[in-house]
Amino acid sequence: MVDFTGAVQVDALAVGIGNAHGLYKGRPNLDFQRLQEVKDVTNVPLVLHGGSGIPGDMIQTAIEIGIRKINVATEIRMAYVQGMLSASAGGDYYEMVTAGKDAVRQMAKSKIDLFLRR
């Protein structure tokens, strides 16, 4: 891996430690030892794909070890849909879109707060 990251001059490296895109059935089993081993041999910023649904304590552990970017698109999309559905009874498209955007804003803020430990 050291040869690879040096040879291709990567900007960031997405690591597979038991994470997966989409939603998890139950608590995910992340391999923090593998994450630490990767961190120990590279200075490249590490990315966690499939961050949606990973509990906060596991996110914090991943950040402590070296994760610098966390992808949570599934949760963001779900927030948008739920927001739109919550405003759908009135049938006003613009109210639905506004509710979806507000839900995305709230979800994004909660994730930023989690990632920054606020």
Where are these regions (language model features)?
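Glycine- and other small-residue-rich loops at beta-strand/loop junctions that grip anionic moieties
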Residues: 24-27, 48-51, 73, 100
